[in-house]
Amino acid sequence: MIKNALSRRSFVRLGLALPALVAAPSVVFAKTISRFSLSKTGHALDGYDTAAYFSAGAATNGADALTVTWKGAVWRFANEEDAALFQANPEAYAPQFGGYCTRAMSLKKEIPGDPEVWRIHDGKLYVFFASRGGTFFDKGPDEMIALAQSHWDTLTFVE
């Protein structure tokens, strides 16, 4: 009798603890990454001018002398006009998902994007690790963005 009572009591305790045990891995193992994919020199988007994708329609290297710091990252620009555009509305020009590859993000991975492989969709900039990511994006951008966003929302960021 005592043995059965202990077993039942243990079973009840396990049943009460199980939801906490199931939820714990998402808290304990949450990924922490830099909000922006930074180059070895600390520049966002590998030092490319993020406003130039919109103003010039091209991936353009920024100049060391023209920088803006936003959300802890240093952003380079090719000209003063692009720097001013970014300063006025950085969220309109910053790459989505912090400059990480959109395709990789949709697959729950964090891989830096290549600023030479990019798309603008619905007025937002998306970068990819390789041209294949852009090709997949072209086949279903909204679906890929939704998948990437759902993963992005689970991440925590080093500020």
Feature locations, PLM:
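Hydrophobic core segments of beta-strands in well-ordered, beta-rich domains
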Residues: 76-77, 126-129
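N-terminal secretory signal peptides and thylakoid transit peptides that target proteins
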Residues: 1-22
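C-terminal partner/receptor-binding element of secreted or periplasmic proteins
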Residues: 138-159
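C-terminal segment of N-terminal export signals and the immediately downstream linker at the start
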Residues: 25-48, 110, 117, 159
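An anionic, turn-rich surface loop/hairpin at beta-sheet edges
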Residues: 96-118
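N-terminal secretory/targeting leader peptides
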Residues: 54-66, 107, 114-117, 124, ...
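N-terminal secretory signal peptides
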Residues: 32-78, 83
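Mid-length scaffold segments of soluble, non-membrane domains
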Residues: 75-100
